A protein has these predicted regions:
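Ligand-binding clefts/hinges and TM-proximal coupling segments of bilobed small-molecule sensing domains
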Residues: 127-146, 222-283, 290-291
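Pocket-lining segment of extracytoplasmic ligand-binding domains
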Residues: 76-78, 85-89, 117, 154-156, ...
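Bilobed "Venus flytrap"/periplasmic-binding protein-like clamshell domains
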Residues: 19-45, 50-51, 107-175, 292, ...
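Sec/Tat signal peptide C-region and signal peptidase I cleavage site
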Residues: 14-18
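Extracytoplasmic small-molecule ligand-binding "clamshell" domains
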Residues: 31-65, 72, 235-237
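Sec-dependent signal peptide recognition
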Residues: 1-8
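Acidic, polar ligand-binding/catalytic clefts
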Residues: 71-105, 188
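An extracytoplasmic/periplasmic, membrane-proximal ligand-sensing/linker region
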Residues: 175-177, 185-202, 207, 214-217, ...
Length: 313
């Protein structure tokens, strides 16, 4: 009897362990970290999974494909570059076991300046102090380079201020070491900077076909989105054209289908709960979760749910 009870206990322990999931995000205070926390809460409350958020200084893709972590909250173009071994991942080879779980919300991103700054356009940043390098988060440097390219500039046209990651960049901006700060709208760091420097203001992008193409050359899949002023968004006083790209969730191919199915289902069915924890989820369109991701195939568990929900491509 004791032997049987021991076996049963081991079985229960293994089952409980199988239902634990980890979600890698960018550093605490970043947009994806706040989104990851909201998703973890839904997975705990609605899917009855043991979800833990792991904030990383780097992208966390290596941890995802190796199995150190289960899910990764990223931007669409970075997942594509990692999967194909291109861009910042050149020379590392393709990662063919990266799988797509679904599209979440658009990253609406912008270069922010102080509200009383004389800069009105991105072109006005020529010769100014801008964060660079991003040794532990190369994707941020790429996004800033895309904004500069939109205005016909490169990093060679500005004063480069090295920084390791996006959160340290915000600290430098608040310490007046830089003239502008990149961040996704609605991020905790933007709210902090807004309070710290007496207000921030976003710089609108050029929507001409040539300018948009320069952005997309660096950010595959990016697009222009018009954003209206809203109390939850700092730095906007009028309808403004900004760069956007999708936040996506990815996982490794070997992750159990039933776990991925539960995650996709819980996110699809609980938009209100997600938005209650992280307001930008108000932009989440569950029916667009199956929007294809360039060069990254769907995870079978996610695709199974999307077919059941009638949204599979």
């Amino acid at each position: 009897m004791k032997f049987n009870l021991a076996i049963a206990a081991l079985g229960l322990s293994a089952a409980a362990q199988a239902q634990s999931v980890s979600i890698i995000t960018t550093p605490v205070g970043s947009f994806s970290n706040s989104a990851g926390a909201a998703m973890a809460k839904v997975l705990v409350d609605k899917a009855k999974l043991r979800a833990v958020v792991q904030a990383q200084a780097s992208t966390g893709f290596e941890e995802t494909v190796s199995g150190t972590a289960d899910f990764n909250v990223s931007n669409s173009f970075d997942a594509t570059l990692f999967a194909t071994g291109s861009g910042e991942y050149e020379g590392r080879g393709a990662h063919k076991n990266l799988r797509y779980v679904g599209a979440l919300i658009p990253y609406r991103v912008a270069m922010h300046v102080r509200a009383d700054s004389p800069f009105q356009r991105i072109a006005d940043l020529k010769g100014k102090r801008i964060s660079s390098e991003f040794n532990t988060q190369k994707t941020i440097g790429r996004i800033i380079a895309a904004h500069l390219a939109n205005a016909g500039l490169t990093y060679n046209d500005v004063q480069k201020v090295p920084t390791p990651n996006v959160v340290r960049q915000a600290d430098d901006f608040m310490s007046n070491k830089t003239d502008t700060m990149f961040f996704a709208l609605g991020s905790a760091a933007i709210k902090q900077a807004n309070a710290s420097v007496g207000g921030v203001r976003v710089l609108e992008v050029d929507t001409s076909p040539e300018a948009v193409k320069r952005v997309q050359d660096l950010l595959p899949g990016a697009y222009i989105m018009q954003v209206s002023p809203h109390p939850s968004v700092e730095g906007l006083s009028k309808l403004t054209n900004l760069v956007a790209f999708d936040m996506v969730m990815v996982a490794r191919a070997e992750l159990a289908d039933d776990v991925v199915y539960q995650v996709a289902k819980a996110l699809y069915e609980n938009k209100a709960e997600l938005a209650a924890t992280f307001p930008p989820f108000a932009l989440f369109n569950p029916k667009a979760m199956a929007k294809p991701l360039l060069s990254v195939p769907f995870h079978p568990g996610a695709l199974k749910f999307f077919k059941e929900a009638g949204i599979a491509p």
